[in-house]
Regions:
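Acidic/polar surface patches and capping/hinge elements
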Residues: 1-282
């Protein structure tokens, strides 16, 4: 987390000046979940669109039309134009460069490598790559337009707004969360993240959980005693599991752990690119 200023306040990342301290973005579960969602959904829509144009143009892949072409990847009978690999590279570059602007040169390098590899492997010709790149960028633009208006830029609030959230919780419930650091940080990370546009859930109220037990109530005390018992008798296995999920520096945060599980299952079950994209999107 960013270090405090001399006056005890805390700086926030600025997407308009991502290289200024603290660097933008400051990766945390809400931001990571949003990035994964846009990236995966864009890939999925891009592949659906690719299949539409593959069978509209229905141009055979070059290696199927010319038996003299040597290939270095498994063959298939799909139409070659536009290249699905080029589409994935282009749409991924577009979305990830917007989400992680300080990494855009590295991301561009990887996208170029991906697209070149398809030609080096004999799977695509230049026009397949060009068509796929154009399609991927077009789909990426649609998703970037959504991201620009989804309300995320208002999720991180200035101190007066975060203080008002704290005061509202105190007035309504009789308690509020307090940061234990010195100097004290404002209320939470992106406290208005709940206002960001939802993907499929109609509204947050439709999935609202029951309220938590009040501090010092019997239910609260039972839960606190259980937690203290765990802490007093923590096993090595429990500690290892807790560290895995701890969302520390250098991790891809809890949302990324689940993407990792999904990718491992995709490989294990030998899913094709369409099914893999669908898994990650949903």
């Amino acid at each position: 987390a960013p270090a405090p200023n001399a006056d005890g306040s805390y700086p926030a990342p600025d997407p308009a000046n991502p290289a200024n301290y603290p660097l933008f973005p400051f990766a945390h579960p809400p931001y990571s979940a949003r990035a994964f969602a846009y990236w995966a959904a864009a890939q999925y829509d891009a592949l659906i669109t690719t299949w539409h144009y593959k069978y509209q143009f229905n141009r055979p892949a070059a290696f199927n039309a010319d038996g003299s072409i040597t290939t270095h990847l498994p063959l298939n009978n799909l139409p070659g134009y536009p290249s699905e690999g080029a589409v994935i590279a282009a749409v991924s570059k577009d979305i990830l460069s917007a989400m992680y602007p300080l990494e855009k040169d590295y991301i561009a390098q990887k996208a170029t490598e991906h697209q070149n590899s398809l030609m080096w492997a004999g799977m695509s010709v230049a026009s397949d790559i060009t068509g796929g790149d154009s399609l991927g960028r077009a789909v990426g633009k649609v998703f970037r337009m959504r991201a620009a208006s989804d309300g995320m830029k208002f999720a991180q609030t200035p101190r007066p707004v975060s203080d008002s959230i704290r005061d509202a919780a105190q007035a309504r419930w009789g308690w509020h969360w307090e940061n234990q650091e010195t100097p004290q940080r404002p209320v939470g990370i992106t406290p208005l993240y709940s206002k960001v546009k939802l993907w499929c859930v109609p509204n947050v109220e439709s999935v609202r959980p029951v309220g938590p037990p009040a501090p010092n109530s019997p239910d609260f005390q039972t839960a606190a005693n259980e937690l203290n018992d765990v802490l007093d008798n923590l096993t090595n296995d429990q500690r290892k599991i807790a560290n895995f999920w701890s969302d520390g520096l250098g991790t891809y945060t809890p949302p990324g752990h689940w993407n990792r599980f999904a990718c491992e299952s995709i490989v294990k079950n030998r899913y094709n690119p369409l099914r893999a994209a669908r898994v990650l999107a949903y």
